[in-house]
Structures are given as structure tokens and as C-alpha cells.
Amino acid sequence: MVFIADYGAGNLRSVHKAFDYLGIEAVVSDKASEMSRYDKVLIPGVGAFGPAMEALNRQGFDEAIREHIDKGRSVLGICLGMQLFLSESEEMGAYKGLDIVPGKVLRFTSSTDKIPQIGWNSVDYCKDSVLFRNVPDQSYFYFVHSYYCAPDEPESVAATTFFAGKKFCSAIEKNGIFAVQFHPEKSSEAGLQVLKNFAEF
């Protein structure tokens, strides 16, 4: 069963609906105290980094997520949820993240591409990955974002994508910590397979 954290900044309905379609039991909850009952935790996210971190902290999800990881259990961050895993972000100022993946969240700059990136883009694998099992390399996924993750540790990068003249980290996989910048719940069969792989890990 998958615990989907409701901290007021998530695409909860579409994520829950995707698991329901896959026949995988998932629960949406705004109570951090309930997280310890589940082996899999998903942190969705749509919105701005600062308010999202404030909400996580206020509801106690920050410590609950760290404790979950310390127990060797797996977690998946989606879009903003991925960015919250990093150490800090420059979005609308300087904000500290969960710091479970060392690195920064930076803004795209481009004179040619329109920002934010909205739409389909391909994903190039950097290593054998649990998340991308049975998903062909360079599959297309759906993105909506103006900021990207820049992890300090290259070995944590599971996949990259090219946008705004830059190859950026579009997926992270590290000791049961998983994160994707794209929205798997909006990415057709490839995205559903990613969610299935996480749930079955």
C-alpha cells in the first residue's frame, strides 16, 4: 500500500486515480503520524518550493519523511516533491529543503525556449533503474516546471532530459529514494509503469 502525503500542494486526485487504475491500494492523508504504517510513501507536488516546505514542516511531514527513510523504506517525489528532497532552492528567494539528496534547485534560463517547460519530453537513462524497468529508454513523459534539480552526487542521477539548452536531472534513484521531475500520473503507459515499479519495489 502507498501513502500519499497531502500537504496542500499536490496533484492528489490524479496520482490516487493512477494507482487505482493499476489496482494498487493507496491512501491520501494529511496526518504525518500515519506515515509509519506504510512501506511506500509518495510526495506529490504542484506549486512553489517555499510554501510547500513550510507546509511540510508545519504538518510534521519533514521529520516523518526522514524517519521513514532512516528505516530503509522507500519514498517517491513527483515534480515539486522531487525538488523538496534537495538541500535548497532559489525559487522566490532562498529556501532550505529536506536535504535528503544533497544539491540545489535552480531556475532555467533561456533566450530561445519558453519557460516553464510544459509538455512532453524524452528521458535518457543514466543507469539501470528500478523506476524505469520495462520502460524503453528515451520514452516521453509529461513535464510542467520552471526549476530543475542539480544534485551534488552524479551517482544519484537516474535519468536526464534536455531543455532550454541544458541537460538536467529528470530522475533520482538512491538507496530507496526515488524522484522524478515529470508527472508519471499524466504520462500514459510509461508513467503508469513507473508508478507500478515504485509500488512493487
From Swiss-Prot:
Keyword Amino-acid biosynthesis: yes
Coiled-coil intervals, chain numbering: none
Example GO biological process: L-histidine biosynthetic process
Domain Glutamine amidotransferase type-1: 1-201
Keyword Lyase among record annotations: yes
Described function: IGPS catalyzes the conversion of PRFAR and glutamine to IGP, AICAR and glutamate. The HisH subunit catalyzes the hydrolysis of glutamine to glutamate and ammonia as part of the synthesis of IGP and AICAR. The resulting ammonia molecule is channeled to the active site of HisF.
Stated name of the protein: Imidazole glycerol phosphate synthase subunit HisH
Lineage per the UniProt record: Bacteria, Pseudomonadati, Chlorobiota, Chlorobiia, Chlorobiales
